[in-house]
Amino acid sequence: MQVGVFIPIGNNGWLISETSPQYMPSFELNKEITQKAETYGFDFALSMIKLRGFGGKTQFWEHNLESFTLMAGLAAVTSKIKIFATVATLTIPPAIVARMASTIDSIAPGRFGVNLVTGWQKAEYSQMGLWPGEAHYTDRYNYLAEYTTVLKDLLETGVSDFKGKYFTMDDCRVSPHPKETKLICAGSSDEGLAFTAQYADYSFALGKGTNTPTAFASVNKRLEAAAEKTGRDVQSFILFMIIADETDEKAMAKWQSYRDGADQEALAWLTQQAAPNAKAGATTNTQQLAAPESAVNLNMGTLVGSYESIAKMLDEIAAVPGTAGVLLVFDDFLRGVEDFGTRIQPLMKSRT
C-alpha cells in the first residue's frame, strides 16, 4: 500500500480547534515535513488549494500558500518522493496548468502529478469575480470534463484543438510535454466517481468515522462499478488523520482535547458554505466535511490509538479492495511523520 502525506499548506493543518497545535504555513515547514517523509519512504506528498478560510477565533485556513509554486519548490529539494499539486479549475486555464506541469516535471522528472478540484466554497471564487453562478453546483463535472480533455491533450501530445462549451483551443501547443503526469480527482458523489473513472488515474476520498478503518469500503465499490463502465483501472487514495501516542488512552485524551476546543465560529462558517452543495446529494465530500459528528477535523477518517493500534488499522485499510494507498494528516506533522516512520510503519504488514 502506498502512503502519502497531505502537507499543511494552510494554517493549523486539518484541526479546527483552539486546543490543537497552532501554526502558520511556510515553505520551510513543508520542506521539513516532505523531506522527512521521503526519508521514511513515503510514496508521495500532496498539497491542497484553498483561497478563503473559515475565520473564527483560530482564523482557520485564512492563511494559505499556493499549491503549484509550493510543490515546485519541494520538487527541487527532494529526489524520490512523488509530488502532487492541486488546481482549482475555476482559476487557472488548463493550458497554463499543462505548462506549469511541464515545468515541474523538468525539475522532478516523472515525479509530478495534478489533483483536480471543481470548487464548492463560493466565497473562494466570488471574492475575485470568478464564481460562475449557482448552476456550477450541478454543471461542474461537465466543466471539469472539458477542462481535463484539454489538459490531457496537452500533457500527452502537446497539442489541443478541442472545441466545447467552456473551452476553445486553436492549435494550442505546450512543449516540452511530460511523458506521464498522473491525475487525481477528489469526489465521492456518483457523478464525481463517474468522472474519475473516465478521466483520472486515482480517486481521492475521505475515510469515515473514528477507528472504523474500513467504513469507506462502499466508496471503493462504487468506483469499481463506475470503472467497469469505462474499462479503466482506477483505484483510491483514502484520507485519514492519525493521532498516535504510546497508549490508546493517551492518544484518545489528545483527540478529546481537540474536540473540546472546537472553534465553533469557524465550524458555523463551514456549514454555511457547504449548504448550497447539498443539492448535489448526500454522497458528496462537502456533505461529509460539514457533518456535525466530527467537523472539528472535517469529518475525515480518524485513527486514534497507540502506535501498534494505528499500524493494525492501517493494515485493515490496505486489505480493502481497490485501495491504492492512504493520504495521511497528523495533529502535529513533524512529530507525526517521525512517529509514523519509526514507530508505526515498522509494525505494518502492508509496508514491509
Curated annotation (Swiss-Prot):
Its EC number is 1.14.99.46. CDD domains: Alkanesulfonate_monoxygenase. Keywords: Flavoprotein, FMN, Monooxygenase, NADP, Oxidoreductase. One of its GO terms (biological process) is alkanesulfonate catabolic process. FMN binds at residues 49-50, 115, 124, 140-141, 189. It comes from the Bacteria. Pfam families: Bac_luciferase. GO terms for molecular function: alkanesulfonate monooxygenase activity; uracil oxygenase activity. InterPro entries: Luciferase-like_dom, Luciferase-like_sf, Pyrimidine_monooxygenase_RutA, SsuD_RutA_monooxygenase. It catalyses: uracil + FMNH2 + NADH + O2 = (Z)-3-ureidoacrylate + FMN + NAD(+) + H2O + H(+); thymine + FMNH2 + NADH + O2 = (Z)-2-methylureidoacrylate + FMN + NAD(+) + H2O + H(+). It is an enzyme of class 1 (oxidoreductase). The FMN-N(5)-oxide reacts spontaneously with NADH to produce FMN. Requires the flavin reductase RutF to regenerate FMN in vivo. Belongs to the NtaA/SnaA/DszA monooxygenase family. RutA subfamily. PANTHER family: ALKANESULFONATE MONOOXYGENASE (PTHR42847), ALKANESULFONATE MONOOXYGENASE-RELATED (PTHR42847:SF4). This is Pyrimidine monooxygenase RutA. It comes from Caulobacter segnis (strain ATCC 21756 / DSM 7131 / JCM 7823 / NBRC 15250 / LMG 17158 / TK0059).
